[in-house]
Amino acid sequence: LFRDVTNKAIHLQHFEGKRVALYGPSTYRWIVNLFGIILAGKDVVLVDSFLPHKERESLLEKVGVDYILSSTNQYILADSHAIMIPGAEKDDVEGEYNPQTPEGNVLVFTATDKESDKAVVLTTQNLMYTVNAMNHHCYCSEHDRVLAQTMLFHIFGLVYSLLWPLANGACVCVGRGLRHIDAETYYYKTTILPGTPSMIEYLKRIKAFNPELRTIVIGGAPSSYKLFENLKDRNYNVYTIYGMAECSGGIAVNREMDGSYELY
């Protein structure tokens, strides 16, 4: 992963623009592009690939992107109108990466009941603060297998399904898509499962919790106490995350039956 990310960063440093939109399914190539953009010193704008074209264009216009990397264009660098840049078909990895390059920021979109989507700018320091705070509450190690079924362009998925496990040396198991969602936990022998309340409720209902699973992290939407209680009664370590994009996805965590939250 590090070699691929570094090569992507070297390639992107040949281009002057400072802000890159990234959208596509959560795959290994998406992850490489995410970290490559950041290491190249450019801001990465995470966009929902399922958005209608005009809505996506409107969001990107708001934040003023210089380039686009998308699965539609096979992650070949394109301009702000999604037109592939001549000569960018193959990554140019000539030269060496300068480790002193300042890291780029991560932009995610958020929305409220009264306002349309707004971009939130998060630094790597912001994100790692949340990761380190989570480590004070929940154990994750290089022996764990964390299933990343949640959308990685959402702050909950980005932090708890990708950054947190990688920071602890755990194996991140990228979901293979909706067709396989019922069998992913058994296929990967998952030990830690982050998910939204509806996702966890569904997997519980279809008996998709594999024998190796020991920890469930719930977030991304309000969760019922009934779900928390039911999972605790089955002897799982359960963590309910309260957070917003503006706070790097972490404000507090609940792991006790009394419903109390511990602040990050």
Regions found by a protein language model. Give the residues of each.
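Flexible, low-complexity linker/hinge segments
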Residues: E57, Q74, A78-N105, T130-V131
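Conserved AMP-binding/adenylation subdomain of ANL enzymes
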Residues: M128-R145, F153-I192
